[in-house]
Amino acid sequence: MTRVVLAAAYRTPIGVFGGAFKDVPAYDLGATLIEHIIKETGLNPSEINEVIIGNVLQAGQGQNPARIAAMKGGLPETVPAFTVNKVCGSGLKSIQLAYQSIVTGENDIVLAGGMENMSQSPMLVNNSRFGFKMGHQSMVDSMVYDGLTDVFNQYHMGITAENLVEQYGISREEQDTFAVNSQQKAVRAQQNGEFDSEIVPVSIPQRKGEPIVVTKDEGVRENVSVEKLSRLRPAFKKDGTVTAGNASGINDGAAMMLVMSEDKAKELNIEPLAVLDGFGSHGVDPAIMGIAPVDAVEKALKRSKKELSDIDVFELNEAFAAQSLAVDRELKLPPEKVNVKGGAIALGHPIGASGARVLVTLLHQLNDEVETGLTSLCIGGGQAIAAVVSKYK
């Protein structure tokens, strides 16, 4: 079977809700990465066969945001593109689709990843197309409903985390401690420059003066403690334990990479970072969507012909501390190998981009001692996706 490799994997900094990227459309964040990847690799843009980009909150952006990003990023009009929505798994699903297209021989080079600007998601006025006869009307927050609401139970994703709290007996202190650890790891990694190799700075033009250049993730907090987090009120349930402090944020960002056949990478003298070994997807009861990575991980390992003990580093999306703790308990993961540079609770969770973001962060950790990695994300609606990669040799 064709060996599929990953190269030139990058991400933007992750902006907080209403932060530095509030006026930067998702497709511009994606275009910044596409332009950088083309420049860095020296690849002829016309040699790219296809562009596949995850993006969840598409309303108001225009037709097919992936196509917009591709053309704004400097690709010729002859290169096709399409947008993927698998909620939080969109970015990783895009990479899987690229992988599949190469294995089948349809493509040799695909630009794949994810992008999201949650700050720019619009308010909707449903059923207003043909006007209202009388009475008050209300707006629907497209970010909350299309991105963060379980449509089957009509409640926020945070309630699915509360459901896992009850099922697994997870305490508030455990969640807050997990969140503090995520922040501390991210602070340490940021201060030590450990994200520098994976981040492409984003220049934001200003009406007056020089552009603002964003180089670091905005959500990383130095002075977080369990004591401070314990003062926060429950966010989703009156007597609950899930708070804004032990959940991932609402964020803006993008992540992208080249997915190639090994033969094409050799032909073009592009040095791969890793080999894609296999993927796994799984579905569960939407009310406990956060536990779905357990089976997705097991499927990915089976398809990769690996055991959990073979994995040197894990990048698992931290949708909620409770969700992460439940998965860790089921899989019995070694904590020293999981999210060693912090996770989404600290870095942020731009939903359509996160699947690609966790893989980018993973790829930049592979070396002669850390040769095999696994990444996974839970997905609203009761799903999960996982992937296994190995350092290219």
From Swiss-Prot:
Active-site residues (renumbered): C88 (acyl-thioester intermediate), H349 (proton acceptor), C378 (proton acceptor)
UniProt record similarity statement: Belongs to the thiolase-like superfamily. Thiolase family.
Upper classification of the organism: Bacteria, Bacillati, Bacillota, Bacilli, Bacillales
Subcellular location: Cytoplasm
EC number: 2.3.1.9
Signal peptide: none
An example Gene Ontology molecular-function term: acetyl-CoA C-acetyltransferase activity
Pfam family, one: Thiolase_C
UniProt name for this protein: Probable acetyl-CoA acyltransferase
Coiled-coil ranges (or none): none
Catalysed reactions, semicolon-separated: 2 acetyl-CoA = acetoacetyl-CoA + CoA
The entry's keywords: Acyltransferase, Cytoplasm, Transferase
GO cellular component: cytoplasm
